[in-house]
Amino acid sequence: MAEIRKLKNYINGEWVESKTDQYEDVVNPATKEVLCQVPISTKEDIDYAAQTAAEAFETWSKVAVPRRARILFNFQQLLSQHKEELAHLITIENGKNTKEALGEVGRGIENVEFAAGAPSLMMGDSLASIATDVEAANYRYPIGVVGGIAPFNFPMMVPCWMFPMAIALGNTFILKPSERTPLLTEKLVELFEKAGLPKGVFNVVYGAHDVVNGILEHPEIKAISFVGSKPVGEYVYKKGSEHLKRVQSLTGAKNHTIVLNDANLEDTVTNIVGAAFGSAGERCMACAVVTVEEGIADEFMAKLQEKVADIKIGNGLDDGVFLGPVIREDNKKRTLSYIEKGLEEGARLVCDGRENVSDDGYFVGPTIFDNVTTEMTIWKDEIFAPVLSVIRVKNLKEAIEIANKSEFANGACLFTSNSNAIRYFRENIDAGMLGINLGVPAPMAFFPFSGWKSSFFGTLHANGKDSVDFYTRKKVVTARFPAPDFN
């Protein structure tokens, strides 16, 4: 049996062994094969990375903005040339099917493209005359060393929200990727190096609690970007703020989709199946709840079950597979416990994800509950799995009232052909990202990922103009010029 490779951290342009003696298996969730082992690093490792990044900041922050942008452009080109390899790594580590993995790679590349626009993004503003012979200018400067804490479910797209923009704007970066998806991160590092990135500008430290706390507490780290669960995100926001750091914390979701009587059912069902069960439901923009008007509910449920019956479950590398595994055994057990809870609390199980699934990996089939109420646990909690709850409602107003009861407010969608309903939905729903006749309202890189309520802690969101503000600080210069005498 071949020896399992132990991964190293990436600090100061080199792969270095962690100070730890603890390693965790990285497992292919579709096969349970151990791919490698990742270090559960220590605060010593973070100290080294932070000092390295702080030293690199002194020179990197002074590199001309067009030069930084050129390196990001080179990185984008290399990512594009290695799409298939990157997608393969996502599939074997995360479990997504190849099509979904390629889609994630594409979104990651879009984020890098946006960051490559740093020369225009870094521009400040000025006013030639604020008083007699006085002018003022507003300049942007990088903030310093930035820490990023990324999740397993989008191992390329989410880190590419973070470090490309931060680095393009003149910061240096320490990434703590998920310990479940490190091989993809290794490839990103390799390609970023080839793009011409200097040593110390980008660093990677694998780990768990000690690494997170090290990032939150280290005095050299000035800002933190986090994506993950609500409990951890709330902790990151509070503790990071206590240490006087700038923090953005993108957390949980319970996204509601509203289906009105006039919706095109074929398109609606296709979109909802993709939104609810794509990526095994392990995404913060997944459709978790459908509220459907009573007049169309029976027909909707029939078409939904018919569509779900055609879903192929299995290894994402296999042809035709739509639904891959959840990430780990614990996640599978947790999902099965929610199915039991839904039954106990009186919901009607119309598609049972416990049936006809392989034990070769951590598989849960598409699960649909009908007759769900807002008192039920499966409505309240973020399940983060291929589980969909359906609630029948009298009208749009009731559907919005139900959605607005949730503590989460990442996204919400509406399927209708009524323009007045669209406007009413837009003005009254409590959610930061809305979709009209589409299932996943995740915005492009040049718009903010704009969660509300318990889906986000902070002021400045990821992506868009918010990300430029998050990773920079401003300096306003006011200057008086004595009136010249050219006579």
From Swiss-Prot:
Question: Can you tell which superkingdom this protein's organism belongs to?
Answer: Bacteria
EC? Answer: 1.2.1.27
Read off the InterPro entries from this record: Ald_DH/histidinol_DH (IPR016161), Ald_DH_C (IPR016163), Ald_DH_CS_CYS (IPR016160), Ald_DH_N (IPR016162), Aldehyde_DH_dom (IPR015590), MeMal-semiAld_DH (IPR010061), MSDH_GmP_bac (IPR023510)
State the protein's name.
Malonate-semialdehyde dehydrogenase
Q: Name one GO molecular function term.
A: methylmalonate-semialdehyde dehydrogenase (acylating, NAD) activity
The family database entries (Gene3D superfamilies) matched by this protein are listed as:
Aldehyde Dehydrogenase, Chain A, domain 1 (3.40.605.10), Aldehyde Dehydrogenase, Chain A, domain 2 (3.40.309.10)
Entry binding sites for NAD(+)? 150, 152, 176, 179-180, 229, 251, 382
Q: Which residues form the active site?
A: 284
Q: What does this protein do?
A: Catalyzes the oxidation of malonate semialdehyde (MSA) and methylmalonate semialdehyde (MMSA) into acetyl-CoA and propanoyl-CoA, respectively. Is involved in a myo-inositol catabolic pathway. Bicarbonate, and not CO2, is the end-product of the enzymatic reaction.
Q: Does the keyword Oxidoreductase apply?
A: yes
> CDD domains in the record, alphabetically?
ALDH_F6_MMSDH (cd07085)
What does the record give as the organism's lineage? Answer: Bacteria, Bacillati, Bacillota, Bacilli, Bacillales
**What is the native source organism of this protein?**
Bacillus subtilis subsp. natto
Among the GO biological process terms of this entry, one is: inositol catabolic process
